[in-house]
UniProtKB/Swiss-Prot annotation:
Protein name: SsrA-binding protein
Principal localisation: cytoplasm
Source organism (scientific name): Chlamydia abortus (strain DSM 27085 / S26/3) (Chlamydophila abortus)
Domain of life of the native organism: Bacteria
Alphabetically ordered keywords of this record: Cytoplasm, RNA-binding
Job description of the protein: Required for rescue of stalled ribosomes mediated by trans-translation. Binds to transfer-messenger RNA (tmRNA), required for stable association of tmRNA with ribosomes. tmRNA and SmpB together mimic tRNA shape, replacing the anticodon stem-loop with SmpB. tmRNA is encoded by the ssrA gene; the 2 termini fold to resemble tRNA(Ala) and it encodes a 'tag peptide', a short internal open reading frame. During trans-translation Ala-aminoacylated tmRNA acts like a tRNA, entering the A-site of stalled ribosomes, displacing the stalled mRNA.
Cellular-component GO terms for this entry: cytosol
GO biological process: trans-translation
Amino acid sequence: MASKEIVSNRKALHNYEVLESLEAGIVLTGTEIKSLRDHGGNLGDAYVAISKGEAWLLNASIAPYRFGNIYNHEERRKRKLLLHRYEIHKLEVKVAQKGVTIIPLGMFLSRGYVKVRLGCCRGKKSHDKRQTIIAREKEREIASAMKRYR
């Protein structure tokens, strides 16, 4: 079954260099899932913290469900990520390196469950960002030139 992306963190790919990525489940309430299906999420300031052998998604904004009642969820609450123990240990080792952090790259639906795509990332400097933009534009020019001369 195909997975459907519902929230993406496009700014993360601009500001960070992704070293490694993996998928994790997430513990959500019913109104959070309904809100995410309406594309009511934002991962702009979100990051992952590991404490006491558990991974937590912090600062991820899921808009309150518009048809929710008094039991609606908090917008920026701490959400637990579902990972195996060895995956959490691997992430802890990566984060121990200088300048590496764990950023959510996107959320998607897979078989009715919401999954989070995580990335071990290192921050880019401004000149690295410029080099990435220049390389992307060169690839675009080459592709258009190849398309013209076929």
